[in-house]
């Protein structure tokens, strides 16, 4: 069976090859055939084989088709009839080369001989363009005797490179008998120097064919090779072996085809490669010259030669072959200098100099003088060349030179392909050396950097532009430096770690971290205002206590009238609450004033009414409860480190902006609120509220800085005001507990959380709200006082941002209180920034004289007009810049003789605090120290002694719980207050504070005991204890400012420990103060909006 199948396949293949040959011969002018016709014939052969029809029938059918196609060519017909009926002798030639392993020769794959055959179409250009569809039509052309073919075609299997078919014209072109190539490798007939070129064309052509879907007409490539001529007896006689082999140049057109796969009779699966066929159409290349020294016309074809800057030829057009006699591969890689006539080298040097000059302009070209060029047969042709070059735009180096050549005069020998016989011309040594030097000079010239004519001018212009740009940048820096500073605070990416450190009560987070954040904007101002410098400024400022506060807060009538604004004051943030403790009415005013600076803060706590006084503060907190209810449900109540960070960022931004304004244009910044600015500047205003303002004036910068973190706490607290209406507002009465912001955020101590809860809890602190979960969970303090149930925390929550007024404190240190105030007014909505400047700049604690405090503690929220010294102290500490007004309106009362933490602890609107401060009597800065102590006490005592605090909510002294300082006003302080004092030995509660409270002049007491002096402010403290003061902010401010100040300032006392607690409480207070703020907002929504606006 195998033998039979082989026999059948062989005739089929022969018939196919013959048919293809005939069709090619008959279609000289037709495009190269596609695989369609061949496949058609092959398919018919396969069909007949499958049907089991006799092979003779298949042969007959094929011959008939071919006859029809070549009707007009009798000679072709006779050849077909003779060859198709029986296997011709070619079969014997094929069989040896195709053994059993080459079954594909039988064309089982549809003409894919030898497994898969690549069809390479090589022949004349016309023949190579044959299209399968035109095979039949070609035969219709008038028949004439087949002329001597100029080209031939052959089919080669890509499986093994064997020639499967050749057209009869091969005999005319190369002299080989038609069947001599069959079964032999095509490469054997290619000149050895061109075999690499042929192989590279095959390897690159196959991928092209595959990528184009093996479309033969699309995958055609052309190249030139030398093919061997036949050495026959006719041409050379009998000495075949001794004669040299002659080669002739041919242009080959390659076309890849893929024959269709089909099942083999023996079930042998044909691989993809077996289907590839290569059709080659070979066309001989003739010399362009007819006569020696021929002068060619201007229309003669041009050819291009490209060489690199080193003179190495990199590309040659195939059109140059007939003109020069070199194949492209013969020239590529050689030096162009070797082909110039030695006498023309000087001319070529001039030409290349012009090339370099023209290279300065992209795309420029020029024609050079004619010069002589060596061709393959050893003669010279005269060339006219148009030169262009390409210069690398980045390196400005010449990449390559392209010469478009036209032969002006031909060689003496017309056949350019003859072997060169002439010997090299004799040249003297001197001439050779000169020529070598010229060649080297040309190469060096081409290697030079190409400079553009305009480069010099452009460089000069660029230098001038750069100098001008630098000059303008310098001017802009000087002119817009303040603006840049202002923009910086708005950035949201202030260093969180630094803020956190402040909140956590690190040693010197306030100023150092703030400086680092703002170092880019105002590095000098922040770097100069280091912590030690802030302390020195604070002490040197000798801030006046309550009496020093000016009426500028009063100027804001709404803030000034502490009595009429009782309710609003109760809603004020903790800072305001403290001021309001003396005259809780101020907290209402604070709402208005703070609204100017930070409308968001004050409005909320309006619900907590003027009862912000120490005793009434609890009531005020209750009023805030309504607002607190709204905010209490809000998750934000929980004070988290992230919220504190966010708040600190805002406060820091505000403080930076405020500081810039104060330094660059303190007057301009004050435009937003001239009254507030005046308040800030005149910290020693006569009004009781001035106590707060004085405190701010004395240490705006540090207070503002400290306030930042505290205000952040307040913001966090705002959410949790809940039922408590803000611990500070409800229970806080006049004395919101001061918790270290740091502690609150960390919530490591139970007291810190308790302070928060106090804001939420109805107790003296939270006013029954107790919803300040964010600050510290349930407020034990809150449970005690129903009076404090009013949610003043909301005020703090809403007004937490407004507390930014406190920021004014920070700039005042560096610039002046007035500037901080203006900054606060502009940044009213950003309480953290307002507090933080103060925080960072100055110690958290201020000492408030006991004498002033004594008068103020007597009156609780009941007497809104009468400012409590404690509240004043607190507001002064909290609002030296922004808190002054706020404190006046705030129900919080500062305890005389107690050091209160920075106003930033109280998350009250700095503006509101400032306004309130104006109204209230000036409170000694000792009050600031009190708040600082209070936070610790508050955090410790409030949690532990909350029941005691709750019991005396009516007593104004309960406010002490917030400040928790043992001051000469112990009577006001409830039993819980006493407990608080015990708990916070290092905080305001220290017993020694009582005596110090009496000394209003001392801004800061050396020990924590001094800070405790603000005990009188504790009227609200009992209920608020730590953060219970009218606005939980007090504690918050105390916490953040106190913690940092404590760590750096009061390491000897419990203060270091209390700051964390205070921070926690401060957070609680902030929440409470936010609730109170909400209440206030209800009372003075218009003012609040104005502030926010």
UniProtKB/Swiss-Prot annotation:
Changing residue 733 to V: In strain: Porto Alegre 4. Residues 557-637, 681-735, 781-800, 856-885, 960-1093 are annotated as: Disordered. It is found in: Nucleus; Cytoplasm, Perinuclear region. InterPro entries: PAS, PAS-like_dom_sf, PAS_fold, Period_circadian_regulator. Keywords: Biological rhythms, Cytoplasm, Nucleus, Phosphoprotein, Repeat. Residues 610-631, 717-735 have a biased composition (Gly residues). CDD domains: PAS (cd00130). Phosphorylated with a circadian rhythmicity, probably by the double-time protein (dbt). Phosphorylation could be implicated in the stability of per monomer and in the formation of heterodimer per-tim. One of its GO terms (biological process) is negative regulation of transcription by RNA polymerase II. GO terms for molecular function: transcription cis-regulatory region binding; transcription corepressor binding. Residues 1061-1093 have a biased composition (Basic and acidic residues). Gene3D superfamilies: PAS domain, Single helix bin. Residues 856-865, 1029-1048 have a biased composition (Low complexity). Residues 789-800, 974-993, 1015-1025 have a biased composition (Polar residues). The keyword Repeat applies. Changing residue 886 to T: In strain: 0811.4. The sequence shown is that of strain Atlixco. Essential for biological clock functions. Determines the period length of circadian and ultradian rhythms; an increase in PER dosage leads to shortened circadian rhythms and a decrease leads to lengthened circadian rhythms. Essential for the circadian rhythmicity of locomotor activity, eclosion behavior, and for the rhythmic component of the male courtship song that originates in the thoracic nervous system. The biological cycle depends on the rhythmic formation and nuclear localization of the TIM-PER complex. Light induces the degradation of TIM, which promotes elimination of PER. This is Period circadian protein. It comes from Drosophila willistoni.
